[in-house]
Amino acid sequence: RYLVFSSDRRQQRRIFLYDLSQRKLLPLPGLNQPRVFYDQPDISRNGRYLVYTSEQEGKTDVFFYDRQTFQSRNLTKTYVGQVRNPTVSGDGRWIAFEGDRTGQWDIEVIDRGVQPDLIESE
């Protein structure tokens, strides 16, 4: 039902959410702040949760956005290394992304169960 994508529309990299059944772009309050780079979005099955990368303060991090509360949360603030290509599970509980803290790209997983904890990949 939903399509999420990033675009350089209006000279700034932003995230857009398109409702395929209503055939229109939906608002994302709290996202797409001026002078902030947003990229690589993914959306949960029901369309409530988004994950994306954003470069703020010179570091790219993975963020989690709840469309019901309009809140974003930095999931990799203390992660040492680069991150890319986040994805969210259908129910919004699990977030996976590529990270290079070991010197090579590995898959890292965050369980949002109670508190997001970083689970190290094997």
Outline where the language-model segments fall.
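Repeat-blade elements of multi-bladed beta-propeller folds
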Residues: 1, 44-45
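Beta-strand-rich domains and repeat architectures in extracellular enzymes and scaffolds
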Residues: 1-7
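A flexible loop/linker signature enriched in serine peptidases of the S9 family
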Residues: 7-16, 32-35, 53-63, 77-80, ...
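Multi-bladed beta-propeller domains
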Residues: 20-38, 65-82, 111-122
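Residue-level detector of Asp-centered blade-edge/turn motifs that repeat once per structural unit
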Residues: 45-46, 90-91
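Blade-level signature of beta-propeller repeat domains, shared across WD40, Kelch, NHL, RCC1
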Residues: 93-122
